[in-house]
Amino acid sequence: MKKILALLLVAMMVISLAACNNKETPDNSQSEVQSESSQVEEPEAVVAELKSLKNKEYGVDYVSLYSKFGKETSIADVEEDPETGFAYIEKDGVKYELGLDFLSMAMVYNTDPAGSDYANADEVYVEWWKLYMQRWNALLPEIPLYSNEYYDLYNAKIKGVEEHQTNPYWTPALALIDWTSEKEDNSIIIGNTTDLSGKFRYAVFGASSPGAADNDVEKLIEGLETVATYTKDGSYIWNPTVVVEHSETENDDGSKTFTVKIAEDLVFSDGSPITAKNYVARAMAFSTPVAAQAAGKDHMALMQYVGYKAFSLYDGTNDGAEVDGVTVSKVMSGIRLIDDYTFAVTVDPEYLPYYYDIAYAGFAPTYLKVWLGDADIVDDGEGCYFTDNFYEKNGDTYVVAEQMKKSATNTDTTYPYSGAYVVKSYDNSDKSAILELNPNFKGNYEGVKPSIEKVVYKKIVSDTQLEDLQAGGIDCISGITGGDETNEAIDMADKSEGKYVYTHYSRAGYGKLGFRADFGPAQYTEVRQAIAYCMDRAKFAKDFTGGYGGVVDGPYYSGAWMYKEAVANGMELNAYATSVDSAIAVLEEGGWVYDKDGNDYVEGVRYKKIPAAEAEEKDINYQSKDGAYKTTKVGDDYYMPLAINWYGTSNNPFTDQLMTGFMENDNIKAAGFVVQNTIGEFSPMLDELYQAAVYGYYSGSPLYNAFNFATGYNSAVYDYAYNLTIDPSMYDDYSQWYIKDLADAYWLK
């Protein structure tokens, strides 16, 4: 960033000419004081180099830029490049480009308007959001392909659907609490094209994000949260059905304590009382090595709270030991049990201020045995801790970890539930679950209790879903999309003489071609950009939605308030207009200019040279699905093929359209790509994306780097903090797109 110095006044004092004749200069001939002004520029700041992270060690070679400068940076320090839309800060004469991790963190943790021209935190949030969106659009971790109108089609015997409509934040699984059923058995059958897996009690168990169908069931069987995060307008609010009193205290050390008193009449589905212990149990459990072993993933549930680091390192034997400079403690000091119905949580100053800080007080009750086995939670005045049997081991395995694994897929009434319904049964063969009314449920955040006695949640196939509805196999088809399917659904309802009704709303989300953006060619920005240039996204959206939708250029909902404000503030996004020439240009600029032998590219599939120092094992072993195109070694360097391995989901019109719109696209071939695919079920696809056996299907060898599925925004809260981290200790557990933005690295050497 150039800084112009103040004008310098240079006084040129001319001494009398007595040196020649030893005479004084007369007053009227005295030289006038002359001055001149000139602009002097500081040397332009050095722009920090963006370097590969491969084969480099976090904490030794580099750390995150946000960890270095984040807390001290305000929006007033940021300069936006008017041509690229990228954001920069200058520190000690060095100009740093701000990456996705930095921007996503600053969006929620750096909203103080002090020292800036912004009036309040909302305006600062919007500016960070705009800068984040512009960078996301440039790096393109995934390609949005359509955003559409959603149509929900119902059996007319389900009443209240028009008076209590669904919307982007209020899905049928939430809305049915206001509906009634005139069917003889007082039931509703909900269909979803996404598979159930049986992970209902904690749908995100072992994963970075939950499966959509599992998440729906979890919403039905879990409830009584202190902060309602699923509301009709998508906002976060205190839940008056649960919370009797709450307070916030800003402490001298910069931490913040939330104290929450719950109602004393809350009970689980079996009538057993719900106390403060039940609210802190799951979060505490999933901050331990016990849960990390069970889930194959460290959920770090209490990461933002005081005492987390010390508590998370406790393994049952090392209280007081020093580990990585931290004194281990069996006590979680930031979680307190004040009395049977009051708990307090203290947020670490590192995570404050926070734009959505009400979320820090959001906890939901869990029956203790589900995640603790026979262990208990105790508070002797210094904080909460588990009794010793929580950490009991059988060899190298935590006994309670095995209990947790079973609980994660428990689908009956072995343990009670806190939500509006309980799971009576689950059939893994046809992916269906039967839920029954919880008679002890106190109500949702509006105090509403459901009247429909039975909910059947089942897997449906989009090709036959309307026939299923007509045959009585389902009562609700939610999220109908695609031109043909939408037209068919509307036509069926209009001609049904009142047997079927529908509602519709604009979707908060989009269908996408997603990537494992750290693997194979998809790890390179230019490859993702080239695919976008090759595809005709506008035509794809029009063909798929039949005119009931369009396309978005980033991860946003066009109805969201921050999007509207960002557009008003001049946000500019690349629409990636179809152009094979543009695709080739970005590929050539990115180094895809070779053939497999390291010679100049002429035709066929392109290759990129990867220097040996930057080649990781996954790069060296990369190949197309059929093995015809492999990374080759020429001299000391490696050459990776421009081969995309795509996993598409079966019985999905979106997959069908991608066959022609992506895989067999003439532009794709002309640009030098080869695309190969597999069609399979949703859960195995997720395992390939995660490169982990979260659902038990992953083979152990990474292969696929492109996937088609969808993104949905079920809350008005927009927060991707930590989801774009480059810190390896958090990356696998938190990464949303598996992308490492090179601008997010601060180099130590």
Q: Which role fits each region the language model picked out?
A:
Residues K157, A295-T397:
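Surface-exposed binding/hinge segments that line
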Residues F205, P210-A212, E218-E222, Y230-D233, ...:
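Gly/Pro-rich hinge or "lid" segments in bacterial periplasmic/extracellular proteins
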Residues A119-L140, I189, T275-M284, D340-A344, ...:
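Alpha-helical secondary-structure segments
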Residues E41-L196, C534-N569, S650, D656-E664, ...:
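Detector for C-terminal structural segments
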Residues Y118-E123, K130, V244-K309, I338, ...:
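Aromatic- and charge-enriched surface segment that lines or borders ligand/interaction sites
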Residues P168, P172, G191-N251:
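N-terminal lobe/hinge region of extracytoplasmic solute-binding protein
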Residues I237, V244, E248, K424, ...:
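Append "and occasionally in soluble cytosolic enzymes with long acidic Gly/Pro-rich linkers
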Residues A292-H299, K424-N440, V456-F519, A530, ...:
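Extracellular/periplasmic solute-recognition and catalytic clefts
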